[in-house]
Amino acid sequence: MKVVVIGAGVVGTASAWYLAKAGHEVTVVDRREGAGLETSFANGGQISPCHAEPWANPSVLPKVLKWLGREDAPLLFRWNRWDPALWAWGLRFLANCSRSRAEINTERTLRVALYSRACLGELRAETGIAYDQQVRGILHVYRDGAEFEHACRAAEVMIRHGLRRLPRTPAECTAIEPALGAVQGELAGGIYTPDDESGDAHKFTRELAALAAAKGVEFRWNVPIQSLLADGDRVAGLATSDGTIRAESYVLAAGCDSPLLARPLGLRLPIIPAKGYSVTVPVDNHAGAPLVSITDDEHKMVYSRLGDRLRAAGTAEMAGYDRMPNPVRNRLILDNARRLFPDGGDFDRAEPWAGLRPVTPDSVPLLGATPLRNLWLNTGHGTLGWTMSCGSGRIVADLVSGRPSAISMDGLGIDRFTSYLW
């Protein structure tokens, strides 16, 4: 079967890989000049099922109110503009903030994330792909005792659903990652997830695209997409700057652009862009930079060692499709990295970056079938696109091929939003 994949980020490229392995004739279309140059380019680097707790949970509302008006807020909503999609998304977000909904959404996200981590391990063993990976786990650190206790309760939900999470004392945290020694006295505790990983998502995407091309996948670069063309209950083609591309099936993996492409077809995807920030710091003192990936819960920032670089990333800014970096937020990340790892690298040579993540109100991706019989979704992964990329790609490849997914699809599709009135 001829299949077109729309988008060559880590999710779209993984989709192409698994579709090619299933025997399909695959074409990937992307407006950029190579793979993984937007959301996947300089993210936090974590393969993190441990981050399955959704943004919408009972504890987030007091925090959002506290953060209102602060440019340095970890989660910044710019509500002072009339954007019906943003306000509708916000109402759905509020509807998912109950404890029961948060646990349901944690299980759904974790189901995909654990499967994806296993798929990544199989792919790595099969191909030998290298991407500055560290298979050393992820350590969450907490300075506030109440936040640590809340995190331990949230960890129990994930443990029930199959994820190993281990509460640790401050001394145990620095034993796991000695580079935390400068802040041991500030810590209330930590939670270690030993089976999680980290690695360079852009390098992985670029290498996987090369492997996919060797399997016959065609990548069409520098081809802006204009629209999806419908014919009744099917997609008839993809209108691009380079003409119309036709196939038997289409996989929409265009990240934040997915709802823009779907809307003219009558398909409303509840996805909004969340701008994330990172800085990449050259490591000039290997003992001072962490090897275990770290999540600083207080500041909602993550740190991953990528070879001779330290990637620090975090915060989320709901500001529409504005891709321009906010220097205040990049500086915030850099300052926190310097405080946590004072000997971690040459902070004066840090490279700032900002990119948009496609976020759903419940933090669960949109996977699988749509009302259009030959259009499939692989989008809406939020901050966990790298984490869920391989599993999501394999799921969609199975469904396109007419095979059942290896995991339950319950609650992962667009149909879960049909009960809403907005």
Curated annotation (Swiss-Prot):
Superkingdom: Bacteria
GO terms for MF: D-amino-acid dehydrogenase activity
Keyword list, A-Z: FAD, Flavoprotein, Oxidoreductase
Transmembrane spans: none
Gene3D superfamilies: D-Amino Acid Oxidase, subunit A, domain 2, FAD/NAD(P)-binding domain
Binding site residues for FAD: 3-17
Pathway noted in the entry: Amino-acid degradation; D-alanine degradation; NH(3) and pyruvate from D-alanine: step 1/1
Cofactor(s) required for function per UniProt: FAD
Any one GO biological process: D-alanine catabolic process
InterPro entries: DadA, FAD-dep_OxRdtase, FAD/NAD-bd_sf
Catalytic activity, reaction form: a D-alpha-amino acid + A + H2O = a 2-oxocarboxylate + AH2 + NH4(+)
Broad EC category: oxidoreductase
EC number: 1.4.99.-
Keyword Flavoprotein (UniProt): yes
GO cellular component, one term: cytoplasm
Family, as annotated: Belongs to the DadA oxidoreductase family.
NCBIfam families, per the entry: PRK00711.1 (NF001933)
UniProt function note: Oxidative deamination of D-amino acids.
Name the UniProt record assigns to this protein: D-amino acid dehydrogenase
Organism of this sequence: Paramagnetospirillum magneticum (strain ATCC 700264 / AMB-1) (Magnetospirillum magneticum)
GN (gene name): dadA
